[in-house]
């Protein structure tokens, strides 16, 4: 399996978290409710999604699950890839 095969289409949305939890910025990105991944999972992707669109906008992007030893898993999408704006 090539590294690119580890990526899959994931629908995410922008939101303002109730607590920062050590992350930077006002607007964050998370998986949408009812999808494969829990909404508590952080998404690392292009800042364009959180800066240039209204809060609540949904996107489809290519992402992979990064499993960190000791927890702290997150979804990663290369910042240079285009995301599809869904709403």
Q: Where are the regions a protein language model picked out?
A:
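Flexible glycine-rich surface loops and low-complexity tracts that mediate binding to linear polymers
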Residues: 56-70
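OB-fold/S1-family single-stranded nucleic acid-binding modules
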Residues: 66-87
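Structural detector for short beta-strands of small beta-barrel domains
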Residues: 2-22
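Short, surface-exposed loop motifs enriched in S/T, G, D/E and P with embedded aromatic residues
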Residues: 12, 18, 43, 61-63
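OB-fold (S1/OB) nucleic-acid-binding surfaces
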Residues: 18-41
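A generic structural signal for short beta-strands and their flanking turns/coil linkers
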Residues: 25, 39, 55-59, 77-81
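Short glycine-rich, polar/acidic loop-and-turn segments at beta strand-coil junctions
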Residues: 33, 47, 63-67
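Beta-strand/loop nucleic-acid-binding surfaces
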Residues: 36-52
């Amino acid at each position: 399996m090539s590294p690119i095969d580890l990526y899959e289409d994931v629908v995410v949305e922008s939101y303002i978290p109730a607590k920062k939890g050590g992350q930077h910025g006002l607007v964050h990105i998370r998986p949408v409710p009812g999808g494969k991944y829990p909404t508590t999972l952080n998404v690392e992707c292009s800042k364009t999604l959180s800066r240039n669109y209204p809060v609540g906008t949904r996107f489809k992007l290519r992402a992979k699950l990064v499993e960190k030893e000791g927890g702290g898993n997150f979804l990663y999408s290369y910042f240079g890839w285009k995301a599809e704006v869904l709403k």
